[in-house]
């Protein structure tokens, strides 16, 4: 089958032919329709320090997808041939304390599709049936293919009650932008997002941001004053991994505020702990998606009117993957879709 793989320990990916995956007793085989390019795939493309330490070579990558079940293992129940599915990209052990307690998103032995094992940038993907998630017919293939990052945004944004709250999001990547739409959809009052990328900030405005702030030109404090915010933000969502953004978020938080961290800062990032301690802030780390509560919430929000369509800005045939990666690398894109049926 055709697949997009890391064949050598260096930059780039190669469209190649690989063996179609075998299907275990508890697996489903998915014929891929659409995939989306993730920031993780960009790290793999660039072959940065993280990728060099993490990605086995050779291996085909990718973990954002939608497709159709074409084969099932003999033990699989609850699915049928022809079901349209996306899937949870974190394959968990099922035996650690958190897995046995139903907290699989906290599994200490997680294996990542397209990171630690063969991925979805291919004509077929085999995964445990437990990880597959049926997609309702009213949700398009394009939207279903971005459920993985949509899930990151949902898990982060809905970690705390947002109804009537003022929310600050630092980092206008696709996940941060989707978090804007989620926060507004569930009833946040002011949703402010910061970045230095004007293209991405304009996307955030299209997704409903109260203010999209280029912090290279505009003061967050001035924006807060314009919005008549006298006590700071109630909820902070750090999506950038940039230390200065995290610092500005902590400074802008109200006493008793709640902060969710999805962005990954450098390991030795220093912060002013006085901002955390004396403000009584609650800080929560976010990894992946809750299985499968996050997935149910994603579907429910789309069915109740959440519009994520502006975040999908580019579409290419899978054979034109280099154009897709170029769009992502340019910084002037939202989500980029690769069509495996073209």
Curated annotation (Swiss-Prot):
Pathway involvement of the protein, from the record: Amino-acid degradation; L-threonine degradation via oxydo-reductase pathway; glycine from L-threonine: step 1/2
Gene Ontology biological process terms from the UniProt entry: L-threonine catabolic process to glycine
Catalyses which reaction(s): L-threonine + NAD(+) = (2S)-2-amino-3-oxobutanoate + NADH + H(+)
SUPFAM superfamilies from the UniProt entry: GroES-like (SSF50129), NAD(P)-binding Rossmann-fold domains (SSF51735)
Residues the UniProt record annotates as site (Important for catalytic activity for the proton relay mechanism but does not participate directly in the coordination of zinc atom): 148
Keywords: Cytoplasm, Metal-binding, NAD, Oxidoreductase, Zinc
Residues that bind Zn(2+) 2: 93, 96, 99, 107
Record SMART domains: PKS_ER
Compartment list: Cytoplasm
Residues annotated for Zn(2+) 1 binding in this entry: 38, 63-64
Cofactor: Zn(2+)
EC number annotated for this UniProt entry: 1.1.1.103
Gene Ontology CC annotations of this record: cytoplasm
Gene3D superfamilies assigned to the protein according to its UniProt record, in alphabetical order: Medium-chain alcohol dehydrogenases, catalytic domain (3.90.180.10), NAD(P)-binding Rossmann-like Domain (3.40.50.720)
InterPro entries according to UniProt: ADH-like_C (IPR013149), ADH-like_N (IPR013154), ADH_Zn_CS (IPR002328), GroES-like_sf (IPR011032), L-Threonine_3-DHase (IPR004627), NAD(P)-bd_dom_sf (IPR036291), PKS_ER (IPR020843), Zn_alcohol_dh (IPR050129)
Pfam families, per database record: ADH_N, ADH_zinc_N
Co-factor: note: Binds 2 Zn(2+) ions per subunit.
Active site positions: 40 (charge relay system), 43 (charge relay system)
Role played: Catalyzes the NAD(+)-dependent oxidation of L-threonine to 2-amino-3-ketobutyrate.
Record's subunit section: Homotetramer.
Family, as annotated: Belongs to the zinc-containing alcohol dehydrogenase family.
Name used for this protein in its record: L-threonine 3-dehydrogenase
Organism: Burkholderia cenocepacia (strain HI2424)
């Amino acid at each position: 089958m055709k697949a997009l793989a890391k064949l050598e320990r260096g930059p780039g990916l190669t469209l190649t032919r690989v063996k179609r995956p075998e299907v275990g007793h508890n697996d489903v085989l998915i014929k891929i329709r659409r995939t989306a390019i993730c920031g993780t795939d960009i790290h793999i493309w660039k072959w940065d320090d993280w990728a060099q330490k993490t990605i086995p070579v050779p291996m085909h990558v990718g973990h954002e997808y939608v497709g159709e079940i074409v084969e099932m293992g003999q033990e699989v129940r609850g699915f049928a041939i022809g079901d349209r599915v996306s899937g949870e990209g974190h394959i968990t052990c099922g035996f650690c304390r958190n897995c046995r307690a139903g907290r699989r998103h906290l599994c200490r032995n997680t294996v990542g599709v397209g990171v630690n094992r063969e991925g979805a940038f291919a004509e077929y993907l085999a995964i445990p049936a437990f990880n597959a998630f049926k997609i309702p017919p009213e949700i398009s293939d394009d939207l279903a293919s971005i459920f993985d990052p949509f899930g990151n945004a949902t898990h982060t944004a809905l970690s705390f009650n947002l109804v009537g709250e003022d929310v600050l999001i630092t980092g206008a990547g696709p996940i941060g932008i989707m978090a804007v739409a989620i926060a507004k959809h569930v009833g946040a009052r002011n949703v402010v997002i910061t970045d230095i990328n004007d293209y991405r900030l304009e996307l955030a405005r299209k997704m409903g941001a109260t203010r999209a702030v280029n912090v290279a030109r505009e003061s967050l404090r001035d924006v807060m004053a314009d919005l008549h915010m006298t006590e700071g933000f109630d909820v902070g969502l750090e999506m950038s991994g940039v230390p200065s953004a995290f610092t500005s978020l902590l400074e802008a938080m109200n006493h008793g505020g709640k902060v969710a961290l999805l962005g990954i800062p450098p390991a030795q990032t220093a912060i002013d702990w006085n901002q955390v301690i004396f403000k009584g802030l609650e800080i929560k780390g976010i990894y992946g998606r809750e299985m499968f509560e996050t997935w149910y919430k994603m579907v429910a929000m789309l069915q109740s009117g959440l519009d994520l369509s502006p975040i999908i800005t580019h579409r290419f045939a899978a054979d034109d993957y280099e154009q897709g990666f170029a769009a992502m690398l340019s910084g002037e894109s939202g989500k980029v879709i690769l069509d495996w049926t073209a």
